[in-house]
Amino acid sequence: MKINKAEFVTSAVAPDHYPVHELPEVALAGRSNVGKSSFINKICQRKALARTSSKPGKTQTLNFFNINDEIMFVDVPGYGYAKVSKTEREKWGVMMEQYLTSQEALRGVVLLVDIRHDPTGDDVTMYNFLKHYEIPVIVVATKLDKIKKSQRQKHEAAVKRKLQFDPSDRFVAFSAETAEGKDEAWKAIYALITEGE
């Protein structure tokens, strides 16, 4: 997939701040420090489109990115970061729920989990939330380069088991370091935005 345009559009915390456009939207969700920004940067072939940070909880707004005038990526705040106040976490929760359940342009969610570990309770809650609201989901298991090739199947099976993964959903193992899984991720995203057209 050739990326000719990848640009930050705006940040928003409420529907009246969402950008006006006619592109299909794909949200990116995951716990803090799972590698959402690295995923966006790698598949968009940009070094700093989305800001990466060693500090979890950096994304605190809905961040909209126009990709090739074809798709709008929406980076949502990472969940599960303990050092953010309870009030702040609740605020993010309301903002995300409002966006995910009411945005007509939303075609689906890329849910990022760390392939090295079992999904957290928050990961399971998010996956169940998406299934409950019948929001199409792609599970992207990041940090693939951090495990041995011989261990991949075992880790993938563990992630799917913990999530009670629906086989009708798409699963992509991905590495932001090596770009492995990049083409598969794009195929899954394109399938998401073209279904039901």
From Swiss-Prot:
Stored InterPro entries: G_ENGB_dom (IPR030393), GTP-bd (IPR006073), GTP-bd_ribosome_bio_YsxC (IPR019987), P-loop_NTPase (IPR027417), Small_GTP-bd (IPR005225)
PROSITE patterns per UniProt: G_ENGB (PS51706)
Keyword Nucleotide-binding: yes
Residues forming coiled coils: none
Domain called EngB-type G: residue spans: 22-195
SUPFAM superfamilies: P-loop containing nucleoside triphosphate hydrolases
Cofactor annotation: Mg(2+)
Biological processes per GO annotation: division septum assembly
Residue numbers binding Mg(2+): S37, T59
GO cellular component, one term: cytosol
Source organism superkingdom: Bacteria
One Gene Ontology term of the molecular function aspect: metal ion binding
Residues reported in the UniProt entry to bind GTP: 30-37, 57-61, 75-78, 142-145, 174-176
Pfam families recorded: MMR_HSR1
UniProt KW keywords: Cell cycle, Cell division, GTP-binding, Magnesium, Metal-binding, Nucleotide-binding, Septation
Matches recorded under Gene3D superfamilies: P-loop containing nucleotide triphosphate hydrolases (3.40.50.300)
Function: Necessary for normal cell division and for the maintenance of normal septation.
Similarity annotation: Belongs to the TRAFAC class TrmE-Era-EngA-EngB-Septin-like GTPase superfamily. EngB GTPase family.
Official protein name in the record: Probable GTP-binding protein EngB
